[in-house]
Amino acid sequence: METATLIAIFISCSLVSFTGYALYTAFGQPSKELRDPFEEHED
C-alpha cells in the first residue's frame, strides 16, 4: 500500500477511537464520577 493510504487509515482509526473513548467517558461507567458545577452552585 502507499504511504498516504496508510497514514489516512491511521488517522481515521485514531479519530474513531478517540470519539468512542469520549462517548464512553461522557455516558458510560466513568460518567458517574464526573461532577456537575451547576448543581454545586444552586442559588
UniProtKB/Swiss-Prot annotation:
It comes from Lopidium concinnum (Moss). May play a role in photosystem I and II biogenesis. InterPro entries: PSII_PsbN. Belongs to the PsbN family. The keyword Membrane applies. This is Protein PsbN. Pfam families: PsbN. Coiled coil: none annotated. It comes from the Eukaryota. HAMAP family: PSII_PsbN (MF_00293). It is found in: Plastid, Chloroplast thylakoid membrane. GO terms for biological process: photosynthesis. One of its GO terms (cellular component) is chloroplast thylakoid membrane. It is a single-pass membrane protein. Keywords: Chloroplast, Membrane, Plastid, Thylakoid, Transmembrane, Transmembrane helix. The chain crosses the membrane at residues 5-27.
